[in-house]
Design a protein with these regions (language model features):
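Active-site and NAD+-binding cores of ADP-ribose-processing enzymes
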Residues: 1-26, 34-37, 44-199
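Active-site rim elements
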Residues: 30
Length: 199
């Protein structure tokens, strides 16, 4: 599966030592990727920093999504994933936790750390446990869509996706490009003709 990542830093491989520094961990601990190139360009500029001198667009590949290798933030957790996690933790997940991928991630993290709030440490702990039982990703639509009871889940999943990859070893860089960006209508966009591949 081909996706994109934007960053002000040039690197040869992904690692999670700086996880959360660019966009935070709202959608879990991991390498944040998107199917939408424009979105990666926008996020090549960290929102909390002054305009950085360099910006890079990464084209990457990850193993394909399968029904039991990812969570979807706003959808119920597949039963095989629930079973593997419950077995690893030695306890049953509450019904509320399995109703949405986000709640499940947070429950795992709080269970592992013994806390009542889900923050950075809890998201990291959840990502490590999920990766250890074959759950590689957290997925959410690029354009946020409210999930309703009568929603067509297949149509929801056909929308362009963002993905948090829990283990950086699952991300392979295919191409790196130095890009220039400019701010248009509060969005960072690619300056036409500025792409230059980096070897």
């Amino acid at each position: 599966m081909q996706l994109y990542h934007g960053s002000p830093s040039l690197f040869d491989r992904f690692d999670l030592s700086g996880a959360g520094e660019g966009t935070g961990i709202k959608y879990g601990f991991g390498v944040y990727l998107t199917e939408v190139e424009k979105s990666a360009v926008h996020y090549s500029q960290p929102r909390h920093l002054e305009l950085q001198p360099d910006h890079y667009l990464y084209t990457v590949e990850i193993p394909d999504l399968t029904p039991d290798n990812h969570l979807v933030s706003a959808l119920p957790v597949p039963a095989p994933i629930v079973s593997r996690v419950e077995e690893r933790l030695g306890q049953k997940a509450p019904d509320k936790a399995v109703a949405k991928g986000k709640e499940f991630r947070q429950w795992i993290g709080m269970t592992l750390t013994g806390t009542k709030d889900a923050g950075f440490a809890e998201e990291k702990a959840a990502a490590e446990l999920l990766d250890s039982v074959g759950v590689l990703y957290n997925v959410w639509p690029n354009a946020q869509v409210k999930v309703t009871a009568d929603m067509d889940v297949e149509a929801y999943m056909r929308k362009p996706k963002n993905i948090a990859v829990f283990n950086a070893d699952n991300v392979r860089i295919v191409k790196r490009e130095h890009i220039e960006i400019e701010n248009k209508y509060k969005k960072w966009v690619l300056v036409e003709g500025s792409r230059r591949e980096v070897q």
